[in-house]
Amino acid sequence: MASKTIEIFFFDAGGGHRNAMHALSQQLSQRHPDWIITPVDLQALLEPIDPVNRLTRRLTGSLNRLLLPVAPNVKLPPWQAQDIYNSALKRGTTRGLGAILPILQGFVRRYQPEIEQILVDRWRDPATPRPDLVLSVIPNFNRVMFCALRAFAADIAYATVITDMVDYPPHFWMEDQDQVMICGTPKAAKQARATGFYVEDKIFEVSGMILKDAFYRPAQPGGPTRAGLGLAPDRPTALIMFGGNGSFRATQTILGQFEKAGLGIQSIVMCGKNTRLLDSLKDRPGCHPVGFVNNVADYMRIADFFIGKPGPGSLSEAVHMGCPVIIERNANTLPQERANVEWVRDNGLGIVVRSFRADLAGAGARMVRDLANYKANIAANIPENRAVFE
């Protein structure tokens, strides 16, 4: 087969989009070593028109000039729009984040001509190999990206991999345009058909969310063990994870509630890039903090259950590794993640609480008591996730 050039557009709001990009890039490169696989960070491309970046660039520029005489080595970077989302997750709050969605979609509408021009100019650049396929793993921008691609060339295929369990219309994942839609759940595929936007042979249903290759590899010699982490081999063990930036507030709440209840639950905390969280847990009994690592699967393998945010990626990873889940569902749950909670409830994959602070002690006791039942539900109700290979 002749060599192909594939572009995968992603951004870093939350981390799941980058994970999907890496997983797809790795598989495509392994199967087709002669293909050119190019990840494209859309946020970086759009930085010149990002209003958050413009504002913070002006503010940090002034502050950096003031700091120069007294702290010449301190340099405050400007923010990108996605940093607002990631900062909120790091603080452990999603309150108000639902309001970001209409603001973001308004930005896309307002700046559509400028966004299209940036994309077209990139594709027209002689240094950019002409793609055979443009693949998107991001929501909200698929209309403007498709229009830009068609302005550049009429014969280049466009596909979207939905990294949520369902669409959240309008103008979130699905748009009225001639493209391929790759859906990770029967409900998302049903939504795609119901729109009437796509012909049947351009709707593909795969067996789940995109997971990294590490979640399919067997345990490796020398991998983490409970004893090696300073934990008791026979005590119930929770893996606590709130994405690549961790969550100080939520994690401290969870650990405090477990300690207060005296349930004997120990924990592995995936802190990601949150060094404040990592440092705060280093001497905490019955708790092993882990910084930013690429082998999350190895830590899930030695945990009994998962506690965290109801994101589609982390839930899918936990369930794939056989870990039942404890998650929150309340007014602060992001609109596009509410369907993930229903997926957990409908399939008996774990426990949904309204508040970690108020309800976690009871949920933890119930999880320990009924752990075997939840694991049996995972085995019976969830097909093996082979999506990245499919």
Per-range role (PLM):
Residues 23, 29-120:
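Conserved N-terminal ligand/cofactor-binding loop architecture of enzyme catalytic domains
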Residues 222-224, 229-302:
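Donor-nucleotide binding loops and adjacent catalytic segments primarily
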Residues 23-35, 152, 257-263:
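A short, Lys/Arg-enriched amphipathic alpha-helix followed by its capping loop at the start of a domain
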Residues 179-245, 272-274:
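A nucleotide-sugar donor-handling region in carbohydrate enzymes
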Residues 15, 20, 84-197:
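Active-site and donor-binding regions of nucleotide-sugar-utilizing enzymes
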Residues 301-311:
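Acidic donor-binding loop of glycosyltransferase active sites
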Residues 315-362:
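Catalytic binding pocket for nucleotide-activated donors in carbohydrate/polymer assembly enzymes
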Residues 221, 351, 357-381:
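Conserved donor-nucleotide binding/catalytic region of nucleotide-linked donor-dependent transferases
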